[in-house]
């Protein structure tokens, strides 16, 4: 079975590579040192510091594994290859819910780069799926678990 690919921009991949380096060169050694110190306290059966450090080690190793997979199977998307006025990964899109006045701006990214607080939505999210391939002036229907709503695409531009 073929591995899943992770569409992303080159900048997203570079960000993941930096995160991976930080985990391997800083966080992993810190956790190993905490485990070593906690072991020195003696009886491991009731050693909460040891348990906490082992839990953190498992978390860090899981993050490392996840990032390595995403980087290994990264599919670099060139936003220039997508039509200038078409929504795709690496594009910034301004939308407005039909019947509302407030405008919203989103950057479309691969799933690895999603960050709702920074306005970066995954191409796999409900809003990302609704917008991909659409153009300025189009109406897109966003399907969510609690219902659907329509948005009008006001502007599409390459993310700076």
Curated annotation (Swiss-Prot):
Pfam families: GreA_GreB, GreA_GreB_N. Keywords: Coiled coil, DNA-binding, Transcription, Transcription regulation. Residues 1-72 form a coiled coil. It comes from the Bacteria. GO terms for biological process: DNA-templated transcription elongation; regulation of DNA-templated transcription elongation. One of its GO terms (molecular function) is RNA polymerase binding. Necessary for efficient RNA polymerase transcription elongation past template-encoded arresting sites. The arresting sites in DNA have the property of trapping a certain fraction of elongating RNA polymerases that pass through, resulting in locked ternary complexes. Cleavage of the nascent transcript by cleavage factors such as GreA or GreB allows the resumption of elongation from the new 3'terminus. GreA releases sequences of 2 to 3 nucleotides. Belongs to the GreA/GreB family. This is Transcription elongation factor GreA. It comes from Streptococcus gordonii (strain Challis / ATCC 35105 / BCRC 15272 / CH1 / DL1 / V288). The lineage of its organism: Bacteria, Bacillati, Bacillota, Bacilli, Lactobacillales.
